[in-house]
């Protein structure tokens, strides 16, 4: 906790570091709710604008990432003119525009004080993450978290989020960065780090969010292969032990058995993924999104308008068992979300923006081998895995996690 108090004291005493102080509490805003997440981005955007116009700091204009983001945001602004409900799309597009200020204020702060940023800021993030981490373990053991919150959904964990079952998203959003922090500053404790990684895998599994567990398992496996190759034999034994433990847990708990065996078995019993999707609610979402895309192939129906369009009877498809449950705020898959809401125009630009950003970041990582950048690359890449369910790209909580990891990923790119 001394690290946390030292961070607060050092940052508050220096007026120029107000933005650093605000950034240092980033994970906390996700625990407090969407209002605080939005305020976080807005305040940092205003600080960024102040620096641009009052201090005439415009170095970011030479950064290719800036123009990539501008290109992406400009495509969203164009989309508003073709949106079926422009007033519904506008706030989400403006929120994405505000993210620009956050990214480059974040990058400027990290570049100017990289050692302080990594040790103090990421250290504080890691402390907050660990508090949530242990709270999740507490709930797994006792059935309620330290505040008495319980999950209304069997086999899922609530933690500090109470009735918002997003513990898995939060875990995924900050887990790789926290792991990077421990590897950078506590590398001498190799056995403890290996044990921590294995416990993280176990906790991610027990949170009960299948999609986030799949993403985390893929991500941590890649992380180990890249940065922990010398310990691969230990990890292999650990993974095998976890597999046996997972099997025991699944078959001793009806909730986990239902989520990880019964529901997954349906994919194989259906003979194909296509048949499985016709039986599932996700399939109904995906099919409706695809039909929306076919009706509006160039510009889609507009950002955040999937919900307004799919309620129409024309999107009912009786080949999909749960077609009457197709309505949702988003299609639960980022590719279908962009295709249905921004059409080919927006989808192609989105892919260009994301893939170019990942390419530039990977190119830099290969040269400098920074674990924090690797953590950002992994999260952003995992966010665009096809078919695996995901949160809405334009909703506050998942978007916040995405842009924070995106900022980490691109902030290490050297000119």
Descriptions of predicted regions:
Residues 1-91, 108-123, 181-191, 233-235, ...:
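Transmembrane signal-anchor hairpin modules in multi-pass inner-membrane enzymes, especially those
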Residues 15-26, 67-68, 72, 329-333, ...:
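Loop-to-helix entry and N-terminal half of a specific, functionally important transmembrane alpha helix
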Residues 22-27, 118-152, 161-230, 249-252, ...:
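Alpha-helical transmembrane segments of multi-pass inner-membrane proteins
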Residues 38-43, 101-102, 169-173, 198, ...:
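Transmembrane-embedded, aromatic-rich helix segments that form part
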Residues 43-49, 220-221, 350-353, 376-388, ...:
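Transmembrane alpha-helices of multi-pass inner-membrane enzymes
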Residues 49, 126, 189, 221-225, ...:
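Hydrophobic transmembrane alpha-helices and their immediate junctions
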Residues 134, 227-274, 285-295, 303, ...:
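A membrane-periplasm/extracellular boundary helix in multi-pass inner-membrane enzymes
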Residues 273-287, 291-295, 299-342:
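Long extracytoplasmic/lumenal interhelical loops at the membrane interface
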